Amino acid sequence: MLTLDKIYHAAFVLKDVARKTDLIEAPRLSKDCQLYLKTENLQVTGSFKVRGAYYKISQLSKEERDKGVIACSAGNHAQGVALAATRRGIKSIVCMPDGAPIMKVENTKNLGAEVCLVPGTYDDAHDKAVELQEETGMTFIHPYDDEQVIAGQGTIGLEILDQLPDVDAVIVPVGGGGLISGVAFAIKSLKPDVKVYGVQAEGAPSMYRSLHEHKYQTLNAVSTFADGIQVKTPGELTYKLCEEYVDDIVTVTEDETAAAILSLMENQKLVAEGAGAVPVAAALFHKLPIEGKKVVCLVSGGNIDVNILNRVITRGLVMSGRKANLTIALEDKPGQLQQVADIVSRCGSNVVSVLHDGSDPNMPISSCFLKLTLETRDNAQIEQIRQELTKAGFQLVAERV
């Protein structure tokens, strides 16, 4: 049974292992509330996961330690298990979905774990880990549906209350539910009036649906670039804890998450992965009743693959009106490109790339598509460019994407 004493004990065990990460105010991220960031993206291994993994492994018997540990993870729990096991001289095997970010896979190997890549999602990796556990007799370290893991994650709740005693609400990312279960239990046990909200990706709303439909359930499929919360099945223990201690769970879109990552980079100089950014996305896009409140967004991790980050930045720029892609139908005659360029210039925008495409079979031979990528200030400037091009007689075939 989870108790506050167990969370305090976890905090004692972790005091020389996990950092007490900073809680920083972020006034540029929200004008509607007093927003703070709990920077677990700056934690050891770049994620909160080391807390639960280390505490769980620290409580194993000698017999269990001698046999070793096995885990499944999209990346962050893998690194936490690898670090904890290596520090305590224990063999570790981690099953990871083959689509896990390369950086997380390599970091897990570098921390001393044997990595087994499994085709499919986190849930497929979980099934493989259970199979290997039965074959080897190693102890399975569940990433979220485990009382000691939850207690380890709950230490973040203790730290938030210590760092901001008059906090009104805490927003937490949700995958399987281990993090929010621990944080909510700790906070509600000490200050029941503090609101605890969860956020899931719109494409992976397993806990959201379970709580809103009052029925524990597994999704047929999930899809989100926020790999840390890409979970089909929430934990059974975490579901019960969320039912009792979590005030509400909302979802955010991929575009909203991308915009939050970009905003954290530009305004706070912080790199967050998709899962770590969803609480900020919920605040930025007004998903929760937090106006005028002191609010903590738990930035759970910063382990984002650089290739994904590049695409996320591009999407975030488009979402914020800082980048636009326009496709214009032109008559293939001299002066058309110059006229378009002049209009864009007069509106104060910069052309990043130009593609003159006459190969579309649906276009007349005498016509072509002009595809532009523009650097813009905001959505208002994009609309101004559209209007000026239309006024000049140009046909916009496709606008921002």
Q: What spans do the regions from the language model cover?
A:
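PLP-dependent amino-acid enzyme catalytic core
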Residues: 1-401
